[in-house]
Amino acid sequence: MDLTYKRQNVYALADENELKAISDYAQGYKKFLDNGKTEREVVAESVEWIEKEGYKPYTLGDAITPGDKLYYNNRGKGLFILRAGSADIAKNGVRILVAHVDSPRLDLKQVPLFEKASLAYLKTHYYGGIKKYQWLTIPLAIHGVVALKDGTNVTVRVGEDENDPVFYITDLLPHLSQEQVTKTIADGFPAENLNLLVGGIPVKDDEKDAVKKGVLQILHDKYGVSEEDFISAELEAVPAVKAKDVGFDRAFVASYGHDDRVCTYPEITATLQTETEQTVLCILADKEEIGSEGNTGMQCVLINDILNEIARSYGVNPSVLREHSKCISADVTAGYDPAYASAFEEMNAGFVNCGVTMNKFTGSRGKSGSNDASAEYIGYLRGVLAKENVIWQTGELGRVDLGGGGTVAKFIANMNIDTVDMGVPVLSMHAPYELISKADIYTAHKAFSAFVK
């Protein structure tokens, strides 16, 4: 009997049928990525998807009965998908899956448009933790909405179609970079310089800000908006690139937004496709990258409101419901990268191709800001995954004292709900173009399916 713990390579153990299933699953995921590059787009895409599966809109206060398939759309930026089961929720609670649909990006400022040296720019304010230099000299698209004073929304999506223009942030040529290259990365790329180049043709017979006015005219002709309308807009600059297979063997997928859509997609497929008597609540949350704040983040009381509605409809004390519920915070982790091996402690790192990764805790340094899941809950999940023959691994987010990160797990756990982080290891996390293994997202689907059973 082998008493040691060893990671298993998913590809090495997969037969031909399993390899085909992994590849086919990734094809659907890549379409999901390309269609949804912002939190609003992911929610809209998901609503369209689940409505085809028979899910209906839910209004707070409505009764919920076993067999119902419902969703609650939170301001177009968050989504709660509910499968009301027949199991006794006073004993079993609710199976909760939570992923987030916001990703690091560049938001346009409220007064963004200016002209300098006959070039028109849009000023940005970065969202989430980025390395600013990675956003220079790459093609960028603009996605989002402009909310007009009459209450209507104008949808903007420029840079994705073959004939669309893209947008661009310049960098300094190496020949004149002697001063720039001596600075630290933090100081060498000021955030106020992350300005999108958006135009260069002046309107005729106008001397002042002629290029800026030309851009405004285009925006007015296409969208019916004026400069003032930027004040009530949510416009995001995101990479204008498609999800692509990586490697001669196509083992990987590179894309913008793997964090955290690589967990969003399998939590939805697990919710829709798994036969179960349990009541399942699948949550797509916003604002995780900036601390889960606001009324679309997981610090909002809305999750408690929905759990209370479930409890009321089933005639169960809400406190009892929460006590017996279980949650997976479906969020990515750092994949071990041999190019940067010193950032990791190899024995306790998540490896790509070795399955979905369970993080008992996250946080930073001395586990600060972490949800530290109990040994008993980890043991329970080990049994669940073993029963369904799911390949998975354990991991930490980098070596101790180097840094760290947080997830939504602690906010769910604060409600007296057993919660643990489980997600796909990512290489180049928070870069404009991240990398994941097709095998790992497939095992995430299998793990989440086992959990909701």
Which sequence ranges carry the predicted segments?
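N-terminal hydrophobic/helix-forming segments and targeting peptides
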Residues: 1-453
